[in-house]
C-alpha cells in the first residue's frame, strides 16, 4: 500500500520567530474537498479544520528557531523544519510531496516537490493548515508578552504597525536580525 505524506511550511516571510512545517498522512476517510490552502481560509475555519485533520490523519510538526534562521538562512531553516516534521511521523511514507521547488536533504525517503502544492494536493493543504494554526498559536502567546507590536494580528510580518513599533520600542529576541528591515536598524 502506498503511503503518501504532504508537507508545507509557514512563517518564511515573518520578521519574528521560528518557521514551522507540518507533515501529514491523510486517512482515506477524510473529506478531501474540505482541504484548501491555509491562506485562503479564515482563522476560525483553519482552527476547525486543524482539529478535523489531526483526528483523521497521522501528522507531525517541525520547526527551526529564530537563531537557526539567522545562522543558516530562511530557505535552509524551512527545509530543516520540513525534515524534522517528516522524521517525526509515526509511519514512514512511501512518497513525500513537498510544497515549493526545493527538497530537504533526507536520505532513504522518496521526495518530490510540487509548485503550489498547497492548492493542488490535499495532504499538502492539510499540512499548511496544521503548520499555520500551530505557528499562529505560538505567535499569539508571544503577543501577550510583547503586546506593543501587534503580533496577534500581523503574525510578525512587516506591516506598517509592526515597523512603527520596531522604531518606537526596538527589537526583541524573537526578531530575525538578518532580515531587512531589522538588519538595516542594527
UniProtKB/Swiss-Prot annotation:
Keywords: Cytoplasm, Endonuclease, Hydrolase, Manganese, Metal-binding, Nuclease. CDD domains: RNase_HII_bacteria_HII_like. Signal peptide: none annotated. Its EC number is 3.1.26.4. Manganese or magnesium. Binds 1 divalent metal ion per monomer in the absence of substrate. May bind a second metal ion after substrate binding. The keyword Nuclease applies. The keyword Manganese applies. GO terms for molecular function: manganese ion binding; RNA binding; RNA-DNA hybrid ribonuclease activity. Its main location: cytoplasm. It comes from the Bacteria. It catalyses: Endonucleolytic cleavage to 5'-phosphomonoester. A divalent metal cation binds at residues 8-9, 99. NCBIfam families: PRK00015.1-3. HAMAP family: RNase_HII_B (MF_00052_B). Belongs to the RNase HII family. Endonuclease that specifically degrades the RNA of RNA-DNA hybrids. This is Ribonuclease HII. It comes from Pelagibacter ubique (strain HTCC1062). The gene is rnhB.
